[in-house]
């Protein structure tokens, strides 16, 4: 993915994405489905996130726009910017730091309840008003890495629970 090299500065410094950024809201939208595709070895396997009829970017962006509109209604000085794995953002890093899951050895973010069947997105926001700048947010802590010495997702990815 050559394009990821382009904006290394923005990936490591969120204030280059949105000036005066104060918070990053990391979100996960589940895509796990009870529908099971046929286990025919002659057919290609398609990842679950691609089973839908619509582009997940459009679905999630619509939801994020609604959330950002609500946040921005709180004050005319609040600004937001969001991405759905399509911007200069380290989605997995923000997800882990926000407590959505831990980084598995297979490089997927894994949540103890939902596995890795979710899309990641981020909302960056800042408050121009001094009243809001001084508000301290309660942040979720990163969660424990449950992988420990397990390597099943690397050895037999089809059998691991992710």
Predicted regions and their residues:
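Auxiliary alpha/beta "docking" domains used to position bulky ligands
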Residues: 1-146
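Iron-sulfur cluster-binding cysteine motifs and their immediate structural context
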Residues: 152-162
């Amino acid at each position: 993915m050559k394009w990821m090299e382009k904006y290394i500065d923005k990936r490591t410094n969120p204030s280059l994405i949105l000036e005066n950024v104060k918070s990053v809201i990391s979100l996960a939208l589940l895509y796990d489905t009870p529908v099971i595709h046929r286990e025919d070895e002659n057919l290609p396997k398609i990842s679950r996130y691609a089973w839908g009829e619509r582009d997940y970017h459009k679905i999630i962006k619509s939801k994020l726009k609604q959330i950002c509109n609500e946040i921005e209604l709180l004050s005319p000085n609040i600004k937001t910017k969001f991405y759905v794995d399509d911007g200069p953002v380290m989605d997995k890093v923000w997800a882990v730091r926000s407590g959505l899951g831990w980084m598995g050895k297979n490089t997927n973010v894994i949540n103890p309840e939902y596995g890795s069947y979710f899309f990641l997105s981020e909302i960056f926001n800042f408050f121009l008003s001094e009243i809001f700048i001084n508000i301290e947010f309660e942040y979720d802590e990163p969660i424990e890495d449950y992988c420990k010495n397990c390597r099943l997702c690397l050895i037999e990815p089809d059998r691991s629970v992710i």
